Amino acid sequence: QFISDIDSCADALAALGLAASERITISMPTSPQGIIAFYAANKLGAVASMIHPLSTAKEIEFYLNVAKSRFALTLDAFYAKFKEVKDATPLSTLILARIPDYLGFVKRIGFNLTKGRLIPKVPPDPMVKWWADLMKGSYPKAAPARMGTDDLAVILYSGGTTGVPKGIMLSNMNFISEGKMVSEWGKLDNATSVLAILPIFHGFGLGVCI
């Protein structure tokens, strides 16, 4: 199912116009949507710019401009911050996910009756695409991009403790080598399951768990 969702997401992103070497900003907590979009972008040869979902509007503006992202994925709860900075950035397509997208029926109802009530409604907006709708759509099959190990795959950001955060450019080989290292260290094989709860917008969580 996971691989199927990645393929479906890649098809949807390609239909929206995301192409090789373009950037998509992923501003998500550790979640199915964030992880699926990460791999889908890589399948297309696009670059995932990973940012903290609790970033301020000013920080989001900075990150979108550094990465030159026309595309972004975030939760519906953070729509207003992206809308606020749209005109000052290259952003043209904002994909909104919802926490209940991957919850079971009972948990989804429970969320909508509690925490969900606190999330402001998103008004009609031509730049907004809903994750759930995209994943149900039908699109031409997107062919995997031909990528080299040294090609740019991800932009992560430094903490900015000594100044303005810097975009750290990571290649495909950075992740391949980290995967091999973790696999060897943990004696992992294709039958092993790992509970990954670290944040995907952080180097540790992205590099080790993803």
Regions found by a protein language model. Give the residues of each.
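Conserved AMP-binding/adenylate-forming core of the ANL superfamily
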Residues: 1-31, 35-39, 56-61, 172
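Conserved pre-ATP/AMP-binding loop-to-beta segment of ANL
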Residues: 119-157, 164, 187-193
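Conserved structural elements of the adenylate-forming
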Residues: 2-8, 135-138, 168-189, 197-201
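Structural core segment of the AMP-binding/adenylate-forming
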Residues: 15-16, 43-133
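Hydrophobic alpha-helical segments in the ANL/AMP-binding
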Residues: 14, 32-51, 60-61, 182-184, ...
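Conserved AMP-binding loop of ANL adenylate-forming enzymes
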Residues: 26, 150-153, 174, 186-210
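Conserved S/T- and glycine-rich ATP-binding loop of Class I adenylate-forming
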Residues: 24, 41, 72, 152, ...
